[in-house]
């Protein structure tokens, strides 16, 4: 497999990479000679107090919470192939949070302080994992997917995005599904993020805006926002989420045989069990993840989460993991991730293979493709 827009096969000089002092490569045979092997998905720290446990969020409840919210958004293009994308403006998210905080003056949430930018943090472990911002590697996935979007769309019946945040790769595939309008074949979107607030504030708003910009006529764009109130101002850079518009979104997506499942909380065995349950019956799954391997402690967990998706019975799975080669100041690296995968695949003779491609950019980034033997091509 090759990608013409700037990905090359894994061919690095040693001096291109900085070795990390901590390694996670530990084969099953070595475990047999020491202590009993514990899969990272079953690690005790994943169920400790303070770690948000996985939960399926109700789409209807989220849509109801967004009623009468006016979204300000940006329309832009992917860097290589100039594919149209939409994302809610970060300042608009903060504006909504401030309004909601004023309405609930007793709110004293550390997560809220971080979301509002009061702590000047991009993330904090087990509190907020950076999902409100769109990170570079998500754009890389969009450009990669755009090379074969028609073939991918014809093949898959489910998309899983792990650590989705603004969910730009899924948004791109969602828009593609809307344009194809093939109602004879179902398509599941399973969007996951550590923070339920991220799913509510950016993941779903981005999908709703994308739907409105893709599906609605000019007349519908105005009518669904005015909702019989002619005094409401309407423009092209904002979308007012009236009851009628939200109902139209929900009904239209269902009529197209598209489902959206949202999962919040930490990775681990409970999370993986939920993924298996949601994907039950799926035959061709595309799994996506970007900027999720930056924490060394969680690197084995995300690796095992992905491998566990590839263990779905009677299901072909293909995964793309996009990341920076090295996360300076944090400790994670794509080399550590790749080494963990290779050791696991080889030691347990898994029917999976992986390949690494490099993104041509100023900041070194890569994408790892993981496939089952009969995965989507």
From Swiss-Prot:
Nucleotide-binding: is it a keyword of this entry?
Answer: no
User: Which is one GO molecular function term here?
Assistant: protein-L-histidine N-tele-methyltransferase activity
E.C. designation(s): 2.1.1.85
**UniProt superkingdom:** Eukaryota
> Does the record's keyword annotation contain Metal-binding?
no
Q: What InterPro entries does the record tag this protein with?
A: Methyltransf_16, SAM-dependent_MTases_sf
- Gene3D superfamilies named among the record's database cross-references: Vaccinia Virus protein VP39 (3.40.50.150)
Keywords, A to Z, come to: Cytoplasm, Methyltransferase, Nucleus, S-adenosyl-L-methionine, Transferase
Q: Where in the cell is it found?
A: Cytoplasm; Nucleus
User: What is this protein's function?
Assistant: Protein-histidine N-methyltransferase that mediates methylation of RPL3 at 'His-243'. Methylates ribosome-associated RPL3, but not free RPL3, thereby regulating 60S subunit assembly. In addition to RPL3, mediates His methylation of other proteins.
Q: Which family does it belong to?
A: Belongs to the methyltransferase superfamily. METTL18 family.
**Could you identify this protein by its name?**
Histidine protein methyltransferase 1
The organism of origin for this protein? Saccharomyces cerevisiae (strain ATCC 204508 / S288c)
């Amino acid at each position: 497999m090759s990608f013409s827009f700037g990905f090359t096969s894994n061919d690095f000089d040693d001096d291109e990479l900085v070795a990390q002092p901590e390694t996670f490569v530990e084969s099953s045979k070595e475990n047999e000679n020491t202590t009993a092997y514990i899969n990272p998905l079953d690690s005790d720290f994943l169920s400790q107090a303070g770690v948000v446990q996985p939960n399926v969020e109700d789409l209807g409840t989220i849509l109801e919470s967004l009623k009468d919210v006016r979204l300000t958004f940006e329309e832009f293009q992917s860097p290589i192939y100039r594919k149209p994308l939409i994302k809610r403006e970060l300042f608009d998210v903060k504006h909504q949070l401030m309004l909601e905080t004023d309405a609930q003056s007793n709110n004293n949430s550390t997560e809220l302080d971080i979301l509002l930018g009061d702590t000047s943090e991009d993330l904090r472990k087990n509190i907020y994992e950076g999902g409100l911002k769109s990170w570079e590697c998500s754009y890389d996935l969009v450009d990669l997917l755009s090379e074969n979007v028609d073939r991918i769309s014809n093949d898959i019946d489910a998309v899983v995005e792990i650590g989705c945040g603004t969910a730009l790769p899924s948004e791109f595939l969602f828009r593609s599904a809307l344009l194809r309008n093939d109602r004879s074949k179902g398509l599941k979107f399973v969007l996951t993020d550590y923070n339920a607030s991220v799913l509510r504030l950016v993941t779903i708003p981005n999908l709703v805006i994308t739907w409105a910009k893709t599906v609605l006529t000019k007349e519908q764009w105005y009518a669904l926002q005015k909702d019989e109130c002619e005094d409401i101002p309407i423009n092209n850079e904002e979308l007012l989420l009236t009851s009628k518009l939200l109902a139209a979104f929900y009904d239209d997506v269902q009529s197209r045989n598209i489902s959206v499942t949202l999962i919040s909380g930490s990775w681990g065995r409970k999370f993986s069990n939920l993924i298996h349950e949601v994907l039950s019956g799926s035959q061709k799954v595309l799994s996506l993840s970007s900027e999720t391997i930056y924490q060394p402690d969680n690197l084995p967990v995300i690796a095992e989460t992905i491998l566990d998706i590839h263990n779905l019975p009677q299901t072909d799975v293909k995964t793309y993991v996009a990341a920076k080669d090295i996360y300076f100041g944090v400790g994670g690296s794509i080399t550590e991730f790749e080494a963990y995968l290779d050791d696991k695949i080889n030691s347990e003779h898994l029917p999976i293979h992986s390949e690494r491609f490099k993104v041509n950019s100023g900041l070194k980034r890569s994408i790892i493709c993981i496939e089952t033997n009969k995965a989507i091509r």
